[in-house]
Regions:
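Basic, Lys/Arg- and aromatic-enriched nucleic-acid-binding interface segment
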Residues: 62-70, 81-144, 152, 163-164, ...
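Short aromatic/basic micro-patch
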Residues: 46, 106, 182-184
Length: 186
């Protein structure tokens, strides 16, 4: 079976039923821009470690290569799971480009205080206090609602996230089950 046939007939319909919209948007983009042009017309059993290594070596950025490989790997693993492919090249030693070192910028305590003081009395003050002080992911901070704050108990309930996907807002459950949590208010 050609990879493109599997994508159109089996894998993409599975994705539309089981994955978050933001994940689907990323998968579709990686498929259209990177995976399909190289492997779409190939039989799934013809895709080899050597071909994948050569393909990955031609990417301009490590991030794009890693995302495209993640999508190709997901496709091939689903085909194996559904008994449509016998050889699992995804478990072999695929050579991914080195990830550039990422050092997040973290506000110092002094910078946090200055930021919070600048928002004193602002309608977003409570939101900013929670987001800064509780270490929320960006989408978790965007998803906060007043009902998530329990002033009597002094806790904040992280119940959802808010993402901007394909030009519209999407409310999503927390990224992982451990992300659904209750935090002490500052």
């Amino acid at each position: 079976m050609l990879l493109q046939e599997f994508w159109n007939g089996r894998f993409w319909p599975y994705c539309t039923r089981n994955l978050r919209e933001s994940t689907r948007v990323g998968y579709e983009s990686a498929w259209r821009l990177h995976v399909m042009p190289c492997f779409g017309g190939m039989g799934m059993d013809a895709i080899s470690v050597e071909l994948v290594d050569k393909w990955l070596a031609n990417f301009d950025t490590a991030g794009a290569a890693r995302k495209a490989w993640a999508v190709l790997r997901a496709i091939l693993r689903r085909a194996i799971r559904w008994n449509l492919l016998d050889v699992d090249i995804t478990r072999r030693d695929i050579q991914l480009p080195a990830k550039p070192h990422y050092e997040p910028q973290i506000l110092t305590i002094r910078q946090q205080r200055a930021l919070l003081q600048g928002f004193y009395g602002h309608p977003l003050e409570a939101w900013l206090i929670c987001a800064v002080s509780c270490g929320l992911r960006t989408e978790e901070g965007y998803g906060l609602e007043w009902s998530d704050i329990d002033l009597r108990s002094g806790v904040l309930h992280v119940e959802r996230g808010l993402q901007w996907v394909s030009g519209h807002e999407v409310t999503v459950p927390p990224k992982t089950e451990l992300s659904r949590r209750t935090l002490p208010l500052p």
